[in-house]
């Protein structure tokens, strides 16, 4: 397993790969949410997983509560891996982090990803229209998490030690969402593909379509018959779609009958 700094893990190093795909996890989880992704792409792509402080291999580090404060260290660790074309996939919170990475790279290095894939995330310019929850008492916080995003694993809910480990990370990640401040800039030049779940009650289709404003390139919206965490329930279809847009071939695919598409 390869490691760039502390922030980037490349599970299957492919030094001759023509492209890299950086994957940004959703709130409360680490890079293992993308377990198996590296195995499902052919040798022409190297998959690199973003590992933020406070989770998995960085458990002893305090999590960030601000996307802006996260950027310098993340970009420093990412920079050695930007020697070939690259793309970003971010899910929920991870999509906003990926978007801000792209804009920071444009400002600092005049580099942009070839493609941004955003899953289950409202467009970054839209206001956050949900009541604050980062500081709620534990029981109310857990109840609100289940209401918005689905139930946490039973082993987390029932184990006091696990709750003590996981809840600070979740609160910090929710703080990143709630405290995010969008600053208007010119649209990115890269293509943007947005994925949504038809059963996701947290993110409206109109909020997904608003990503169109963030690119001067091609925009594509694809909907899965899933909820907010369709990256698990529809993993094969999602990988098939990402690979197709990157002109790659996943090692394993399934029919895409559960996918609806809007392209511009």
Pin down the residues of each PLM region.
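Domain-scale detector for complete catalytic domains at protein termini or as standalone homologs
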Residues: 1-89, 93-264
């Amino acid at each position: 397993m390869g490691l760039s700094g502390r922030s980037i893990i490349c599970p299957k190093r492919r030094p001759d790969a023509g492209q890299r795909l950086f994957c940004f996890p959703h709130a409360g989880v680490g890079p293992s949410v993308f377990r198996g992704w590296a195995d499902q792409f052919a040798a022409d792509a190297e998959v690199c997983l973003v590992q933020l402080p406070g989770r998995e291999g960085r458990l002893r580090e305090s999590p960030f509560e601000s996307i802006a404060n996260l950027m310098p260290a993340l970009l420093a660790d990412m920079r050695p891996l930007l020697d070939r074309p690259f793309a970003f996939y971010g899910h929920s919170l991870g999509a906003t982090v990926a978007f801000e990475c792209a804009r920071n790279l444009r400002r600092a290095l005049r580099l942009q990803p070839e493609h941004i894939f955003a899953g289950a995330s409202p467009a970054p310019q839209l206001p956050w229209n949900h009541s604050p929850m980062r500081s709620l008492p534990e029981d109310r916080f857990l109840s609100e998490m289940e209401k918005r995003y689905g139930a946490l694993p039973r082993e987390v809910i029932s184990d006091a030690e696990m709750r003590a480990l996981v809840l600070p990370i979740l609160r910090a990640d929710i703080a990143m969402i709630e405290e995010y401040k969008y600053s208007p800039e010119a649209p990115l030049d890269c293509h943007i593909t947005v994925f949504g779940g038809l059963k996701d009650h947290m993110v409206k289709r109109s909020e997904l379509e608003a990503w169109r404003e963030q690119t001067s390139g091609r925009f594509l919206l694809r909907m899965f018959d899933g909820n907010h965490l369709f990256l698990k329930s529809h993993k094969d279809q999602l990988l098939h779609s990402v690979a197709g847009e990157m002109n790659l071939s996943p090692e394993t695919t399934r029919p895409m009958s559960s996918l609806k598409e809007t392209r511009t």
